[in-house]
């Protein structure tokens, strides 16, 4: 079986995971390449990158503005889809520049001794608001990358066939997603969620199912003896870390928060 998209970075010396960036592409590159002086580093954005709110040409211009800085620093940026991203930029028409790429769901990143599974998607708790906004429109088949503010196929998908294929060739030790298993923070249903659930009767159940997708992925990796040790995710705009009884470290990243995944010897 074909394991899907594999990203190899044999020349990288480091890995950094970023929380949501919400379209702040220039800020991310400046922060990594200039403010922190990163070099030879793979930077993985854990969703809510901001692809889809502008026309495709906008994102090409952003890349062209930043590619010189990325090249000089020998850094690469890999984006995973969040709920505030058009899935077409990841699964149907992925961006494939040398240093600037979008990762289809169930991609594997192989670098610095790690084999990293990337799975995107989440539910927008404010989806009812977005679908009633004047800027929202139903997607057109002949314009899959047209600008919009909501995408109904935002949810994550459990794909056992892809996991089976991955298991034949890889031993996953790290996973990067946008949201997280159901036992990870945040687990409260207050604030904006409670407000939005009043006008979206399916929201509570849909979010429950969304989190269970990652429960199933975790169960699959465990039952197939993958040496999972790290899980990174964003989505909740807060920072949190915990280690479970199996020794897996879960890392929730705040907006633009950066966390290093240490290279293996």
Model-derived segments and spans:
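Core catalytic region of metal-dependent phosphoesterases/phosphodiesterases
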Residues: 18, 23-112, 207-210
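Short, solvent-exposed loop/turn segments at secondary-structure junctions
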Residues: 22-24, 49-52, 84-86, 121-125, ...
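A short acidic (Asp/Glu
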Residues: 27-29, 54-57, 89-92, 129, ...
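Extreme N-terminal starter segment of soluble prokaryotic enzymes
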Residues: 11-16
